[in-house]
């Protein structure tokens, strides 16, 4: 079988941080790893895995976290980080297969959070039960729990991450306010806000996990760089390395092992997993890691691929794939950028901070539920500053916005495994995704609303740019769907795999419906909810055997 060339860890030593994060961190697995049984093995160090590990460690459990990537050196920008990440087979815009699919944002310690913009929206009530407007064949889009069940976890995380900024007017009345004051709007955001208000919109500050003021032992944002292009130089952004993993790295009952890829889950009997087979990517040696519980937090593409690779005599189609739904129902969210320019005060154009700092400081949800939109529901519009990989406009102020909207779950959109092998000898990941025509109609409607907003702001030279969402995305959902019925879902309401009692999934895989907002905070809230349940279960089990 043909091998797809991927990055070798030994070729990328300049991108790796020369120092460990703390005493609990090292690259690779030491000899004798198989001799120990951990309370919990967390697979993946990104948005959800770090939250789960933090809760489990602080509940007194012995936790091993394995992460395929490495800790990045401070100078590594998004371009270089992307070049270190393994790609996947995917369809291009014409429907042809290419090897340029994106099965993650970046592959490194902290995952995509080290380059995300910090957008931290709470989902809306509609997102938990959209069935009145979202009609799909053979797919249950109702979540197995409600927004009210998740609100306490949102509140904890907003305080921990230092989320700053408000919410859409009238949303979540009655829940405690757990956010700090909003960041100052950018010059572009002020123009967009005024234009939106003239259209009858209700703009609000984009909620951001970025310190406006010092918080949690981390500095305030210095606006030194654009958050989506570079690692945060001050620690102000609430990426999971700064907020969760760095403090954990000094904890005696936590072990963080980077450069370790989870190849497959192994079973000695039906109904549970006995070990995870891991590859030390520096030495090329395989190790068997044992734990009482396994928390899978790789993202909605990589977690599905791990389960599909985990074929055993007890799970011949892959662990958790009893319903043949693992990998199916992949949702990416549709999105598009629109931009234009307006005249501005020369002092604003000369200000070096005009195009740095938070990527978004104003948002609009006036078309989230919109009877004029095809299907009756639209999505989000928000400021989205251009990252520094693209030429900035120096003789005018650029207004750049993005619209994001949920896609209809479709079982034919799926993650699969190829006959081609990757550089580690594993089946390459296949992303088979085709947008629903109904969603493309909704996207056209929303881009029209974006163009109207820009024209109202006086923008000229308006142009649009695709985000390439169909080939992969930083918003990944739905491949290990949650539900009460094991025949129609992969995991239960707590993220536990129906057919493997000691395996939990805490990333966006669990989402029955992707929601129309940036999902990171919601994924983290689910991870916190699930990890608290795991800790309670293990404590009860331990007490029963004393």
Swiss-Prot record:
Enzyme class, UniProt record, top EC level: oxidoreductase
Gene3D superfamilies linked to this entry: FAD/NAD(P)-binding domain (3.50.50.60)
Functional pathway: Antibiotic biosynthesis; lividomycin biosynthesis
Disulfide bond residue pairs: none
Region described as Disordered: 1-30
Gene Ontology MF, one: oxidoreductase activity, acting on the CH-OH group of donors, oxygen as acceptor
Keyword Oxidoreductase attributed: yes
Protein name: 6'''-hydroxyparomomycin C oxidase
């Amino acid at each position: 079988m043909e091998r797809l060339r991927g990055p070798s860890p030994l070729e990328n030593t300049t991108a790796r941080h020369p120092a460990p994060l703390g005493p609990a961190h090292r690259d690779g697995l030491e000899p004798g790893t198989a001799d120990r049984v951990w309370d919990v093995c967390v697979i993946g160090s990104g948005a959800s895995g770090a939250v789960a590990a933090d809760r489990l460690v602080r509940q007194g459990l012995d936790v091993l976290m394995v992460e395929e990537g490495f800790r990045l050196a401070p100078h590594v920008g998004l371009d270089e980080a992307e070049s270190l990440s393994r790609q996947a087979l995917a369809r291009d815009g014409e429907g042809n297969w290419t090897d340029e699919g994106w099965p993650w944002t970046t592959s490194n310690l902290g995952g995509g959070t080290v380059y995300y913009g910090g957008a931290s929206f709470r989902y809306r009530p509609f997102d938990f039960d959209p069935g009145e407007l979202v009609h799909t064949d053979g797919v249950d889009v109702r979540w197995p729990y409600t927004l009210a069940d998740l609100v306490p976890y949102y509140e904890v995380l907003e305080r921990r991450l230092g989320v700053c900024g408000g919410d859409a007017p009238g949303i979540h009345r009655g829940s405690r306010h757990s956010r700090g004051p909003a960041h100052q709007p950018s010059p572009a955001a002020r123009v967009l806000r005024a234009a939106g208000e003239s259209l009858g919109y209700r703009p609000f500050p984009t909620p951001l996990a970025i310190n406006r003021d010092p918080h949690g032992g981390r500095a305030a944002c210095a606006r030194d760089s654009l958050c989506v292009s570079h690692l945060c130089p001050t620690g102000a952004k609430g990426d999971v390395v700064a907020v969760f993993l760095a403090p954990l790295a000094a904890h005696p009952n936590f072990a963080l092992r980077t450069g370790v890829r989870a190849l497959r889950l192994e079973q000695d009997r039906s109904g549970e997993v006995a070990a995870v087979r891991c590859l030390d990517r520096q030495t090329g040696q395989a190790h068997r890691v044992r734990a009482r519980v396994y928390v899978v937090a790789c993202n909605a593409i990589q977690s599905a691929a791990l389960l599909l690779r985990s074929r055993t005599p007890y799970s011949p189609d892959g662990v958790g794939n009893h319903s043949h739904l693992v990998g199916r129902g992949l949702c990416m969210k549709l999105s598009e950028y629109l931009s234009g320019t307006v005249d501005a005060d020369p002092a604003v154009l000369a200000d070096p901070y005009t195009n740095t700092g938070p990527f978004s400081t104003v948002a609009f949800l006036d078309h989230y539920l919109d009877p004029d939109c095809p299907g009756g529901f639209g999505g989000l519009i928000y400021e989205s500053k251009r990252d520094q990989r693209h030429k900035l406009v120096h003789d005018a102020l650029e207004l750049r916005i993005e619209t994001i909207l949920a896609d209809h779950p479709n079982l034919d959109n799926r993650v699969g495994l190829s006959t081609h092998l990757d550089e580690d000898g594993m089946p390459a990941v296949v992303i088979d995704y085709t947008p629903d025509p109904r969603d493309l109609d909704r996207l056209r409607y929303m881009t029209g609303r974006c163009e109207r907003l820009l024209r109202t702001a006086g923008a000229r030279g308006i142009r649009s740019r695709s985000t390439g969402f169909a080939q992969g995305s930083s918003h990944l959902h739905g491949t290990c769907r949650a539900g009460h019925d094991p025949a129609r879902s992969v995991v239960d309401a707590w993220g536990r795999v129906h057919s493997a009692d000691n395996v939990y999934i805490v990333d966006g895989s669990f989402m029955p419906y992707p929601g129309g907002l940036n999902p990171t905070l919601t994924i983290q809230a689910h991870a916190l909810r699930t990890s608290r349940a795991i800790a309670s279960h293990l404590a009860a089990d331990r007490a029963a055997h004393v």
